[in-house]
């Protein structure tokens, strides 16, 4: 349980920092691959994914004997990818406006939810080895798309910066 709390804190802090890294780095494109380059929903998903992927270097050592590690990790990543836009657009639809505090809370709710699911899935009965292989492939696909969609964003509302109405690196103000 202590490791869960530490993971939530570390991922939250690193995600918060990565929101500003692109600006701090004078718009370094390599830094931009792993940090937020604009204010789109996708870039906010990215700042939750980056520290989670980095944290995998640590939790992989801690959970290396868990049969469910890769399954739990892919579910954790998918929760971030799905829950963030669901909560953001859900509250935006219900209340017809953005609220900066709610936006920030959503980020932390998503981190807490995904890390808690990761922790709990490592406690249940082992999943079939085939599920773990599929999970590894899915993690690699997520990471590949993560990089690709930063370089070549889809012309869709998830990738559109609401401030500049542009996409990807071009969406930076």
What are these language model-derived features?
Residues 20-39:
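Membrane-interface helix-loop junction between the first two transmembrane segments
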Residues 55-56, 72-89:
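Small-polar-interrupted transmembrane alpha-helices in polytopic inner-membrane proteins
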Residues 33-46, 173:
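Short aromatic-rich membrane-water interface segments that cap or initiate transmembrane helices
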């Amino acid at each position: 349980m202590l490791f869960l709390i530490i993971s939530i804190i570390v991922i939250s802090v690193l995600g918060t920092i990565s929101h500003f890294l692109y600006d701090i780095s004078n718009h370094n494109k390599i830094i931009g691959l792993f940090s937020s380059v604009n204010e789109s929903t996708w870039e906010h998903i990215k700042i939750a994914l980056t520290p989670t992927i980095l944290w995998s270097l640590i939790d992989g050592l801690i959970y290396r004997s868990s049969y469910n590690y890769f399954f739990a990790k892919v579910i954790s990543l998918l929760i971030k990818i799905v829950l963030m836009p669901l909560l953001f657009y859900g509250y935006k639809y219900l209340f017809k406006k953005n609220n900066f505090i709610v936006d920030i809370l959503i980020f932390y709710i998503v981190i807490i939810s995904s890390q808690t699911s990761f922790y709990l899935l490592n406690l249940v009965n082992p999943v079939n080895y085939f599920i773990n292989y599929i999970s590894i492939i899915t993690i690699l696909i997520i990471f590949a798309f993560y990089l690709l969609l930063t370089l070549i964003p889809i012309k869709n509302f998830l990738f559109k910066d609401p401030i500049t109405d542009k996409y990807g690196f071009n969406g930076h103000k």
